[in-house]
Amino acid sequence: MSWYSVDSEIESLERRHAGHHHTVNIKYGYVILALSIVHMVLSISGKKLYFKNWAETGRASSWWRSVVSIPFWVSTLVWLAIFAFLSIFHIEELSENYTTAVKRLGRMAYCLVPFTIFISLRPPNTVGYQSGYYLEKLNLHKWISRLIFATAIGHGLGFLYKWTKEGALAEKIFKFDNFLGVTVFALMPVLIFASVNVMRRRNYRLFYILHNVTLWMFVVLIAFHARPGVPLLAVINLALLGYQIYQRFFKSYYLHDISVVESPYSKMQIIRIPRPETFPSYLPGSHIRLGYSATNISAWLYATHPFTIASTNDDSESTLDLVMNKPVNFPIDITSPYTMTGPFPSLPPQFYTTARHVNIICGGSGISFGLPIYKYFVNSNRSIPIRLIWCIRSSDDTFILDHLLPERSIDVQIYITSNTGSLNQQQSASTIFDEEADALLEGDSTTNIEMANLATDKEEKKTDHFNTIHDGRPNFDDAFGNLAAAVDVDEKWLIACGPRKLIDDCRKWTKGKDIEFYSELYEM
Protein backbone atom coordinates (compact mmCIF):
# COMPACT_ATOMS: atom_id res chain seq x y z
CA MET A 1 0.00 0.00 0.00
CA SER A 2 1.43 3.38 -0.96
CA TRP A 3 1.85 6.28 1.44
CA TYR A 4 -0.63 8.17 -0.73
CA SER A 5 -3.38 5.57 -0.22
CA VAL A 6 -2.75 5.42 3.54
CA ASP A 7 -2.99 9.20 3.82
CA SER A 8 -6.20 9.18 1.79
CA GLU A 9 -7.72 6.54 4.05
CA ILE A 10 -6.82 8.50 7.17
CA GLU A 11 -8.32 11.65 5.65
CA SER A 12 -11.49 9.71 4.84
CA LEU A 13 -11.79 8.46 8.42
CA GLU A 14 -11.27 11.96 9.77
CA ARG A 15 -14.07 13.27 7.57
CA ARG A 16 -16.39 10.50 8.79
CA HIS A 17 -15.70 10.86 12.48
CA ALA A 18 -14.51 14.44 12.85
CA GLY A 19 -11.38 13.30 14.65
CA HIS A 20 -13.36 11.45 17.35
CA HIS A 21 -14.28 7.87 18.01
CA HIS A 22 -17.49 6.83 16.28
CA THR A 23 -19.21 6.45 19.66
CA VAL A 24 -18.66 10.08 20.62
CA ASN A 25 -22.35 10.98 20.23
CA ILE A 26 -23.56 8.36 22.72
CA LYS A 27 -22.86 10.60 25.70
CA TYR A 28 -24.97 13.42 24.27
CA GLY A 29 -27.96 11.11 24.14
CA TYR A 30 -27.46 10.28 27.80
CA VAL A 31 -27.13 13.97 28.60
CA ILE A 32 -30.59 14.52 27.09
CA LEU A 33 -32.00 11.55 29.03
CA ALA A 34 -30.47 12.84 32.27
CA LEU A 35 -31.80 16.37 31.73
CA SER A 36 -35.28 15.02 31.01
CA ILE A 37 -35.17 13.04 34.27
CA VAL A 38 -34.13 16.20 36.11
CA HIS A 39 -37.04 18.04 34.49
CA MET A 40 -39.50 15.35 35.62
CA VAL A 41 -38.13 15.19 39.17
CA LEU A 42 -38.17 18.96 39.59
CA SER A 43 -41.71 19.17 38.22
CA ILE A 44 -43.10 16.50 40.55
CA SER A 45 -41.12 17.73 43.56
CA GLY A 46 -42.24 21.29 42.95
CA LYS A 47 -45.88 20.22 42.86
CA LYS A 48 -45.51 18.31 46.13
CA LEU A 49 -43.89 21.26 47.87
CA TYR A 50 -46.54 23.62 46.48
CA PHE A 51 -49.41 21.49 47.79
CA LYS A 52 -47.63 20.92 51.11
CA ASN A 53 -47.19 24.66 51.57
CA TRP A 54 -50.83 25.22 50.59
CA ALA A 55 -52.05 22.70 53.19
CA GLU A 56 -49.82 24.12 55.93
CA THR A 57 -50.56 27.81 55.36
CA GLY A 58 -54.20 27.50 54.31
CA ARG A 59 -53.72 29.46 51.12
CA ALA A 60 -52.28 28.95 47.66
CA SER A 61 -48.92 30.72 47.48
CA SER A 62 -48.61 32.88 44.39
CA TRP A 63 -44.82 32.44 44.51
CA TRP A 64 -45.03 28.66 44.58
CA ARG A 65 -47.66 28.73 41.85
CA SER A 66 -45.34 30.73 39.60
CA VAL A 67 -42.57 28.19 40.25
CA VAL A 68 -44.67 25.13 39.37
CA SER A 69 -46.65 26.79 36.58
CA ILE A 70 -43.84 27.74 34.23
CA PRO A 71 -45.47 28.30 30.80
CA PHE A 72 -45.03 25.41 28.40
CA TRP A 73 -43.45 27.70 25.82
CA VAL A 74 -40.68 28.63 28.25
CA SER A 75 -39.86 24.96 28.83
CA THR A 76 -40.02 24.33 25.08
CA LEU A 77 -37.61 27.19 24.34
CA VAL A 78 -35.19 25.90 26.99
CA TRP A 79 -35.23 22.45 25.40
CA LEU A 80 -34.79 24.01 21.96
CA ALA A 81 -31.75 25.94 23.22
CA ILE A 82 -30.31 22.76 24.76
CA PHE A 83 -30.70 20.88 21.48
CA ALA A 84 -29.21 23.74 19.45
CA PHE A 85 -26.20 24.00 21.76
CA LEU A 86 -25.46 20.28 22.13
CA SER A 87 -25.95 19.54 18.44
CA ILE A 88 -22.81 21.51 17.52
CA PHE A 89 -20.89 21.41 20.81
CA HIS A 90 -17.23 20.46 20.43
CA ILE A 91 -17.46 20.01 16.66
CA GLU A 92 -14.66 21.78 14.83
CA GLU A 93 -15.08 22.92 11.24
CA LEU A 94 -18.80 22.25 11.20
CA SER A 95 -19.08 22.67 7.45
CA GLU A 96 -16.69 19.76 6.99
CA ASN A 97 -17.89 17.64 9.91
CA TYR A 98 -21.62 18.32 9.72
CA THR A 99 -22.42 14.60 9.67
CA THR A 100 -21.34 14.39 13.32
CA ALA A 101 -23.98 17.00 14.18
CA VAL A 102 -26.55 15.27 12.00
CA LYS A 103 -25.97 11.94 13.75
CA ARG A 104 -26.14 13.65 17.12
CA LEU A 105 -29.51 15.19 16.29
CA GLY A 106 -31.00 11.78 15.63
CA ARG A 107 -29.70 10.31 18.88
CA MET A 108 -30.83 13.27 20.98
CA ALA A 109 -34.31 13.11 19.44
CA TYR A 110 -34.70 9.44 20.35
CA CYS A 111 -33.38 10.01 23.87
CA LEU A 112 -36.05 12.64 24.54
CA VAL A 113 -38.91 10.29 23.63
CA PRO A 114 -39.21 8.81 27.18
CA PHE A 115 -39.85 12.31 28.50
CA THR A 116 -42.69 13.11 26.10
CA ILE A 117 -44.30 9.71 26.73
CA PHE A 118 -43.98 10.16 30.50
CA ILE A 119 -45.68 13.54 30.58
CA SER A 120 -48.58 12.13 28.55
CA LEU A 121 -49.30 9.34 31.06
CA ARG A 122 -52.65 9.49 32.83
CA PRO A 123 -52.38 7.92 36.28
CA PRO A 124 -55.95 7.61 37.63
CA ASN A 125 -56.99 8.95 41.03
CA THR A 126 -53.47 10.15 41.80
CA VAL A 127 -53.01 9.84 45.56
CA GLY A 128 -53.28 13.27 47.12
CA TYR A 129 -53.07 14.85 43.66
CA GLN A 130 -49.37 15.20 44.41
CA SER A 131 -48.15 14.91 40.83
CA GLY A 132 -50.66 17.47 39.62
CA TYR A 133 -53.21 17.38 36.84
CA TYR A 134 -52.08 15.39 33.80
CA LEU A 135 -53.81 17.76 31.37
CA GLU A 136 -51.61 20.60 32.62
CA LYS A 137 -48.73 18.93 30.76
CA LEU A 138 -50.66 18.58 27.52
CA ASN A 139 -49.20 21.59 25.69
CA LEU A 140 -45.70 20.69 26.81
CA HIS A 141 -46.18 17.15 25.48
CA LYS A 142 -47.40 18.54 22.17
CA TRP A 143 -44.49 20.93 21.66
CA ILE A 144 -41.78 18.59 22.92
CA SER A 145 -43.11 16.01 20.46
CA ARG A 146 -42.85 18.59 17.68
CA LEU A 147 -39.30 19.36 18.75
CA ILE A 148 -38.45 15.65 18.57
CA PHE A 149 -39.98 15.28 15.13
CA ALA A 150 -38.36 18.47 13.80
CA THR A 151 -34.98 17.30 15.10
CA ALA A 152 -35.46 13.87 13.54
CA ILE A 153 -36.43 15.51 10.24
CA GLY A 154 -33.23 17.57 10.43
CA HIS A 155 -31.31 14.32 10.94
CA GLY A 156 -32.97 12.79 7.88
CA LEU A 157 -32.45 15.83 5.67
CA GLY A 158 -28.80 15.95 6.64
CA PHE A 159 -28.21 12.42 5.42
CA LEU A 160 -30.26 12.91 2.27
CA TYR A 161 -28.02 15.88 1.47
CA LYS A 162 -24.89 13.83 2.20
CA TRP A 163 -25.97 10.89 0.05
CA THR A 164 -27.03 13.17 -2.80
CA LYS A 165 -23.70 14.97 -2.65
CA GLU A 166 -21.91 11.61 -2.82
CA GLY A 167 -24.09 10.45 -5.72
CA ALA A 168 -25.23 7.42 -3.73
CA LEU A 169 -28.79 8.44 -2.80
CA ALA A 170 -30.62 5.42 -4.24
CA GLU A 171 -28.05 2.98 -2.92
CA LYS A 172 -28.06 4.41 0.60
CA ILE A 173 -31.84 4.84 0.95
CA PHE A 174 -32.56 1.18 0.26
CA LYS A 175 -29.90 -0.16 2.57
CA PHE A 176 -31.94 -2.00 5.23
CA ASP A 177 -31.00 -0.07 8.37
CA ASN A 178 -31.16 3.24 6.49
CA PHE A 179 -34.53 2.34 4.96
CA LEU A 180 -36.00 1.91 8.46
CA GLY A 181 -35.05 5.50 9.24
CA VAL A 182 -36.30 6.78 5.88
CA THR A 183 -39.68 5.13 6.53
CA VAL A 184 -40.09 7.00 9.81
CA PHE A 185 -38.73 10.18 8.23
CA ALA A 186 -41.43 10.06 5.53
CA LEU A 187 -44.21 9.87 8.13
CA MET A 188 -43.10 12.81 10.25
CA PRO A 189 -43.93 15.73 7.90
CA VAL A 190 -47.36 14.17 7.35
CA LEU A 191 -47.97 13.98 11.10
CA ILE A 192 -46.78 17.53 11.68
CA PHE A 193 -49.16 18.76 8.98
CA ALA A 194 -52.03 16.73 10.47
CA SER A 195 -51.28 18.15 13.93
CA VAL A 196 -51.93 21.75 12.88
CA ASN A 197 -55.01 22.96 14.75
CA VAL A 198 -57.21 23.37 11.68
CA MET A 199 -56.36 19.95 10.28
CA ARG A 200 -56.47 18.18 13.62
CA ARG A 201 -59.88 19.53 14.51
CA ARG A 202 -61.24 18.77 11.07
CA ASN A 203 -60.36 15.08 11.36
CA TYR A 204 -59.08 14.22 14.81
CA ARG A 205 -59.43 10.48 14.28
CA LEU A 206 -57.03 10.60 11.34
CA PHE A 207 -54.57 12.63 13.39
CA TYR A 208 -54.84 10.21 16.31
CA ILE A 209 -54.15 7.17 14.12
CA LEU A 210 -51.20 8.91 12.43
CA HIS A 211 -49.86 9.97 15.82
CA ASN A 212 -49.90 6.45 17.23
CA VAL A 213 -48.57 4.76 14.09
CA THR A 214 -45.70 7.24 13.82
CA LEU A 215 -44.87 6.98 17.53
CA TRP A 216 -44.72 3.18 17.51
CA MET A 217 -42.72 3.09 14.29
CA PHE A 218 -40.34 5.70 15.65
CA VAL A 219 -39.79 3.77 18.89
CA VAL A 220 -39.41 0.34 17.26
CA LEU A 221 -37.77 1.00 13.88
CA ILE A 222 -35.25 3.54 15.14
CA ALA A 223 -34.11 0.99 17.72
CA PHE A 224 -32.85 -1.09 14.77
CA HIS A 225 -31.83 1.91 12.67
CA ALA A 226 -29.60 3.65 15.23
CA ARG A 227 -25.86 3.07 15.03
CA PRO A 228 -24.49 2.65 17.68
CA GLY A 229 -27.60 0.97 19.07
CA VAL A 230 -29.99 2.34 21.69
CA PRO A 231 -31.16 -0.80 23.56
CA LEU A 232 -31.65 0.91 26.93
CA LEU A 233 -33.71 3.74 25.44
CA ALA A 234 -35.76 1.29 23.39
CA VAL A 235 -36.59 -0.74 26.51
CA ILE A 236 -37.60 2.42 28.41
CA ASN A 237 -39.81 3.64 25.57
CA LEU A 238 -41.50 0.27 25.10
CA ALA A 239 -42.04 -0.06 28.86
CA LEU A 240 -43.78 3.33 29.00
CA LEU A 241 -45.96 2.52 25.99
CA GLY A 242 -46.76 -0.86 27.53
CA TYR A 243 -47.83 0.87 30.73
CA GLN A 244 -50.21 3.05 28.72
CA ILE A 245 -51.82 -0.03 27.18
CA TYR A 246 -52.01 -1.71 30.58
CA GLN A 247 -53.77 1.27 32.15
CA ARG A 248 -56.23 1.59 29.30
CA PHE A 249 -57.26 -2.03 28.81
CA PHE A 250 -56.31 -3.95 31.94
CA LYS A 251 -56.97 -1.36 34.66
CA SER A 252 -60.23 -0.09 33.19
CA TYR A 253 -63.79 -0.81 34.29
CA TYR A 254 -66.05 -2.69 31.92
CA LEU A 255 -69.46 -1.07 31.72
CA HIS A 256 -72.89 -2.51 31.01
CA ASP A 257 -76.46 -1.33 31.64
CA ILE A 258 -75.81 2.30 30.75
CA SER A 259 -78.98 4.39 30.69
CA VAL A 260 -79.87 7.70 29.05
CA VAL A 261 -82.06 10.47 30.49
CA GLU A 262 -83.21 13.06 27.99
CA SER A 263 -85.88 15.61 27.16
CA PRO A 264 -87.38 15.78 23.65
CA TYR A 265 -86.81 19.54 23.35
CA SER A 266 -83.31 19.72 24.80
CA LYS A 267 -80.09 18.99 23.03
CA MET A 268 -78.51 17.83 26.26
CA GLN A 269 -78.75 14.39 27.75
CA ILE A 270 -77.65 12.64 30.92
CA ILE A 271 -75.74 9.38 30.69
CA ARG A 272 -76.01 7.25 33.81
CA ILE A 273 -73.36 4.63 34.46
CA PRO A 274 -73.81 2.12 37.30
CA ARG A 275 -70.95 2.85 39.67
CA PRO A 276 -68.55 -0.13 39.79
CA GLU A 277 -68.12 -1.61 43.26
CA THR A 278 -64.37 -1.03 43.19
CA PHE A 279 -64.60 2.52 41.85
CA PRO A 280 -62.62 4.72 44.27
CA SER A 281 -63.67 7.89 46.00
CA TYR A 282 -63.17 10.99 43.89
CA LEU A 283 -63.07 14.74 44.27
CA PRO A 284 -65.79 16.97 42.81
CA GLY A 285 -64.94 18.04 39.28
CA SER A 286 -63.12 14.80 38.49
CA HIS A 287 -63.57 13.17 35.12
CA ILE A 288 -63.49 9.70 33.62
CA ARG A 289 -62.56 8.54 30.14
CA LEU A 290 -64.88 6.34 28.13
CA GLY A 291 -63.73 4.01 25.40
CA TYR A 292 -64.94 1.06 23.42
CA SER A 293 -64.55 -2.51 24.62
CA ALA A 294 -61.18 -4.11 23.84
CA THR A 295 -62.98 -6.54 21.51
CA ASN A 296 -64.05 -3.59 19.35
CA ILE A 297 -61.47 -2.56 16.75
CA SER A 298 -62.37 1.09 17.42
CA ALA A 299 -60.82 0.76 20.87
CA TRP A 300 -57.42 0.21 19.28
CA LEU A 301 -57.77 2.88 16.62
CA TYR A 302 -59.44 5.79 18.39
CA ALA A 303 -58.88 7.79 21.54
CA THR A 304 -60.86 7.53 24.73
CA HIS A 305 -63.24 10.39 25.49
CA PRO A 306 -63.13 12.48 28.69
CA PHE A 307 -66.37 13.34 30.47
CA THR A 308 -66.78 15.16 33.76
CA ILE A 309 -68.61 13.28 36.50
CA ALA A 310 -71.62 15.48 37.19
CA SER A 311 -72.65 13.47 40.26
CA THR A 312 -70.93 13.61 43.64
CA ASN A 313 -68.98 11.06 45.63
CA ASP A 314 -71.79 10.75 48.18
CA ASP A 315 -72.37 7.15 49.28
CA SER A 316 -76.00 7.44 48.19
CA GLU A 317 -74.93 8.01 44.59
CA SER A 318 -75.26 4.63 42.88
CA THR A 319 -74.48 6.01 39.43
CA LEU A 320 -71.87 8.15 37.75
CA ASP A 321 -73.80 10.81 35.86
CA LEU A 322 -72.38 12.49 32.76
CA VAL A 323 -73.82 15.42 30.81
CA MET A 324 -73.34 15.41 27.05
CA ASN A 325 -75.11 16.70 23.99
CA LYS A 326 -76.86 14.90 21.19
CA PRO A 327 -75.84 14.05 18.63
CA VAL A 328 -72.20 13.51 19.52
CA ASN A 329 -69.21 12.00 17.80
CA PHE A 330 -69.10 9.44 20.57
CA PRO A 331 -72.72 8.26 20.62
CA ILE A 332 -73.73 5.99 23.47
CA ASP A 333 -75.37 2.71 22.48
CA ILE A 334 -76.95 1.36 25.66
CA THR A 335 -76.75 -2.19 24.28
CA SER A 336 -72.97 -2.08 23.77
CA PRO A 337 -70.21 -2.57 26.35
CA TYR A 338 -67.74 0.21 27.10
CA THR A 339 -64.60 0.68 29.15
CA MET A 340 -63.94 3.43 31.67
CA THR A 341 -60.72 4.68 33.23
CA GLY A 342 -60.33 7.13 36.06
CA PRO A 343 -61.27 9.04 38.06
CA PHE A 344 -58.93 11.89 37.22
CA PRO A 345 -59.04 14.86 39.63
CA SER A 346 -58.80 18.43 38.41
CA LEU A 347 -58.72 20.69 41.46
CA PRO A 348 -56.44 19.59 44.33
CA PRO A 349 -57.80 18.55 47.77
CA GLN A 350 -56.36 21.74 49.30
CA PHE A 351 -58.87 23.80 47.35
CA TYR A 352 -61.80 22.11 49.05
CA THR A 353 -60.37 22.54 52.54
CA THR A 354 -59.10 26.12 52.29
CA ALA A 355 -61.49 28.00 49.94
CA ARG A 356 -63.51 30.60 51.86
CA HIS A 357 -65.63 32.18 49.13
CA VAL A 358 -66.45 30.55 45.78
CA ASN A 359 -68.35 31.63 42.68
CA ILE A 360 -68.81 29.25 39.77
CA ILE A 361 -69.94 30.12 36.25
CA CYS A 362 -70.68 27.43 33.65
CA GLY A 363 -71.50 27.57 29.97
CA GLY A 364 -73.68 24.82 28.51
CA SER A 365 -72.39 21.34 29.34
CA GLY A 366 -69.85 22.94 31.67
CA ILE A 367 -72.54 22.48 34.31
CA SER A 368 -71.18 18.96 34.73
CA PHE A 369 -68.00 20.45 36.18
CA GLY A 370 -69.45 23.27 38.24
CA LEU A 371 -72.45 21.48 39.74
CA PRO A 372 -70.65 18.82 41.82
CA ILE A 373 -68.27 21.46 43.21
CA TYR A 374 -71.26 23.62 44.10
CA LYS A 375 -73.07 20.72 45.76
CA TYR A 376 -69.97 19.80 47.74
CA PHE A 377 -69.73 23.22 49.37
CA VAL A 378 -73.49 23.52 49.91
CA ASN A 379 -73.58 20.16 51.67
CA SER A 380 -70.36 20.62 53.63
CA ASN A 381 -70.25 21.93 57.17
CA ARG A 382 -68.03 24.87 56.28
CA SER A 383 -70.90 27.24 55.38
CA ILE A 384 -68.84 29.35 53.00
CA PRO A 385 -70.51 31.74 50.54
CA ILE A 386 -71.08 29.86 47.28
CA ARG A 387 -72.83 30.86 44.05
CA LEU A 388 -73.47 28.97 40.82
CA ILE A 389 -74.30 30.66 37.51
CA TRP A 390 -75.27 28.63 34.45
CA CYS A 391 -75.45 30.15 30.96
CA ILE A 392 -77.47 28.22 28.38
CA ARG A 393 -79.14 28.95 25.06
CA SER A 394 -82.48 27.29 25.74
CA SER A 395 -84.73 26.95 28.77
CA ASP A 396 -85.36 23.37 27.66
CA ASP A 397 -81.92 22.47 28.99
CA THR A 398 -82.94 23.19 32.58
CA PHE A 399 -84.32 19.65 32.85
CA ILE A 400 -80.73 18.69 33.67
CA LEU A 401 -81.12 20.27 37.10
CA ASP A 402 -84.36 18.39 37.78
CA HIS A 403 -82.32 15.19 37.75
CA LEU A 404 -78.96 16.32 39.07
CA LEU A 405 -80.03 18.91 41.64
CA PRO A 406 -83.23 17.70 43.30
CA GLU A 407 -82.65 19.80 46.45
CA ARG A 408 -85.33 22.44 46.02
CA SER A 409 -83.78 24.75 48.61
CA ILE A 410 -80.68 25.39 46.50
CA ASP A 411 -80.75 28.44 44.28
CA VAL A 412 -78.93 28.45 40.93
CA GLN A 413 -78.72 31.56 38.78
CA ILE A 414 -79.59 30.63 35.18
CA TYR A 415 -78.98 32.96 32.23
CA ILE A 416 -80.68 32.12 28.94
CA THR A 417 -78.74 33.81 26.16
CA SER A 418 -81.19 32.95 23.35
CA ASN A 419 -84.96 33.27 23.36
CA THR A 420 -85.54 30.79 20.57
CA GLY A 421 -85.00 27.54 22.35
CA SER A 422 -84.61 26.08 18.87
CA LEU A 423 -82.89 22.75 18.76
CA ASN A 424 -81.34 23.62 15.42
CA GLN A 425 -79.58 26.65 16.83
CA GLN A 426 -77.74 24.69 19.50
CA GLN A 427 -74.46 23.10 18.70
CA SER A 428 -72.99 19.94 20.08
CA ALA A 429 -71.37 20.24 23.50
CA SER A 430 -70.55 17.05 25.28
CA THR A 431 -67.14 16.70 26.74
CA ILE A 432 -64.31 18.52 28.41
CA PHE A 433 -61.06 20.22 27.58
CA ASP A 434 -59.33 20.57 24.25
CA GLU A 435 -59.24 17.70 21.81
CA GLU A 436 -55.49 17.55 22.43
CA ALA A 437 -56.50 15.69 25.58
CA ASP A 438 -56.47 12.58 23.40
CA ALA A 439 -60.18 12.67 22.82
CA LEU A 440 -62.38 13.47 19.86
CA LEU A 441 -64.20 16.32 21.48
CA GLU A 442 -67.08 18.44 20.52
CA GLY A 443 -67.84 21.37 22.72
CA ASP A 444 -69.64 24.58 23.45
CA SER A 445 -68.12 26.81 20.82
CA THR A 446 -68.23 30.54 21.22
CA THR A 447 -71.21 30.59 18.88
CA ASN A 448 -73.08 28.21 21.11
CA ILE A 449 -73.16 30.09 24.40
CA GLU A 450 -73.26 33.69 23.35
CA MET A 451 -71.23 35.59 25.93
CA ALA A 452 -70.72 38.82 24.02
CA ASN A 453 -72.79 41.46 22.25
CA LEU A 454 -75.96 40.49 24.07
CA ALA A 455 -78.25 42.58 26.18
CA THR A 456 -77.75 42.10 29.90
CA ASP A 457 -80.33 41.04 32.44
CA LYS A 458 -83.75 41.90 30.99
CA GLU A 459 -86.17 39.68 32.81
CA GLU A 460 -86.23 37.57 35.94
CA LYS A 461 -88.60 34.78 36.93
CA LYS A 462 -88.82 31.70 39.12
CA THR A 463 -89.17 28.11 38.05
CA ASP A 464 -90.70 25.41 40.19
CA HIS A 465 -87.12 24.40 40.93
CA PHE A 466 -86.48 27.64 42.84
CA ASN A 467 -83.78 28.61 40.35
CA THR A 468 -83.61 32.26 39.34
CA ILE A 469 -83.80 32.62 35.56
CA HIS A 470 -82.59 35.66 33.63
CA ASP A 471 -82.78 36.55 29.95
CA GLY A 472 -79.49 37.72 28.46
CA ARG A 473 -75.91 37.42 29.55
CA PRO A 474 -74.67 38.01 33.09
CA ASN A 475 -73.08 41.29 34.07
CA PHE A 476 -70.00 40.14 35.95
CA ASP A 477 -69.93 43.10 38.33
CA ASP A 478 -73.44 42.22 39.45
CA ALA A 479 -73.18 38.44 39.21
CA PHE A 480 -69.91 38.28 41.14
CA GLY A 481 -70.45 41.38 43.24
CA ASN A 482 -70.49 39.36 46.46
CA LEU A 483 -67.07 37.95 45.62
CA ALA A 484 -65.48 41.31 44.84
CA ALA A 485 -67.02 42.90 47.94
CA ALA A 486 -65.42 40.38 50.32
CA VAL A 487 -62.23 42.43 50.64
CA ASP A 488 -61.26 40.98 54.03
CA VAL A 489 -61.47 37.35 52.92
CA ASP A 490 -58.54 35.29 51.67
CA GLU A 491 -58.85 32.35 49.31
CA LYS A 492 -61.62 33.80 47.14
CA TRP A 493 -62.15 31.75 44.01
CA LEU A 494 -63.86 32.22 40.68
CA ILE A 495 -64.24 29.00 38.70
CA ALA A 496 -65.23 29.15 35.04
CA CYS A 497 -66.05 26.18 32.83
CA GLY A 498 -67.27 26.55 29.29
CA PRO A 499 -66.18 28.08 25.96
CA ARG A 500 -63.01 30.09 25.54
CA LYS A 501 -64.80 33.44 25.33
CA LEU A 502 -66.43 32.89 28.71
CA ILE A 503 -63.15 31.85 30.31
CA ASP A 504 -61.19 34.76 28.84
CA ASP A 505 -63.79 37.28 30.00
CA CYS A 506 -63.81 35.82 33.52
CA ARG A 507 -60.03 35.81 33.72
CA LYS A 508 -59.92 39.48 32.71
CA TRP A 509 -62.54 40.33 35.33
CA THR A 510 -60.45 38.82 38.15
CA LYS A 511 -57.36 40.90 37.30
CA GLY A 512 -56.37 43.15 40.20
CA LYS A 513 -59.13 41.85 42.48
CA ASP A 514 -57.10 39.40 44.61
CA ILE A 515 -59.30 36.55 43.41
CA GLU A 516 -57.96 33.11 42.56
CA PHE A 517 -59.06 31.86 39.15
CA TYR A 518 -59.45 28.35 37.79
CA SER A 519 -60.94 27.27 34.48
CA GLU A 520 -61.85 24.21 32.44
CA LEU A 521 -62.17 24.69 28.71
CA TYR A 522 -65.16 23.02 27.05
CA GLU A 523 -64.49 23.63 23.43
CA MET A 524 -63.88 21.83 20.17
Swiss-Prot record:
Assigned EC number: 1.16.1.-
Localization terms from the record: Membrane
A GO BP annotation: reductive iron assimilation
Residue span, Ferric oxidoreductase domain: 105-222
Keywords, sorted A to Z: Electron transport, FAD, Flavoprotein, Ion transport, Membrane, NADP, Oxidoreductase, Transmembrane, Transmembrane helix, Transport
Membrane-spanning segments: 24-44, 69-89, 104-121, 143-163, 179-199, 206-226, 230-250
Record carries keyword Iron-sulfur: no
Protein family membership: Belongs to the ferric reductase (FRE) family. AIM14 subfamily.
Annotated protein name in UniProt: Probable metalloreductase AIM14
Organism: Scheffersomyces stipitis (strain ATCC 58785 / CBS 6054 / NBRC 10063 / NRRL Y-11545)
Gene, per the UniProt record: AIM14
